[in-house]
């Protein structure tokens, strides 16, 4: 899980979602997991 100021899709399988008011990126590749903070 990377915590970043700006979250972006890294590959085409990444999807940007909102959970509990936080913007997150979830993907089949666990290295692509990000959250805004």
From Swiss-Prot:
One of the protein's GO biological processes: translation
A cellular component annotation (GO) from this entry: ribosome
InterPro entries: Ribosomal_bL36, Ribosomal_bL36_sp
Keyword list, A-Z: Ribonucleoprotein, Ribosomal protein
Any Pfam family matching the protein: Ribosomal_L36
GO molecular function terms listed in the Swiss-Prot or TrEMBL record: structural constituent of ribosome
Keyword S-adenosyl-L-methionine: no
Entries under NCBIfam families matching the protein: rpmJ_bact
UniProt family annotation: Belongs to the bacterial ribosomal protein bL36 family.
PANTHER family assigned to the protein according to its UniProt record, in alphabetical order: 50S RIBOSOMAL PROTEIN L36, CHLOROPLASTIC (PTHR42888), LARGE RIBOSOMAL SUBUNIT PROTEIN BL36C (PTHR42888:SF1)
Name of the protein in question: Large ribosomal subunit protein bL36
Species, as recorded: Nostoc punctiforme (strain ATCC 29133 / PCC 73102)
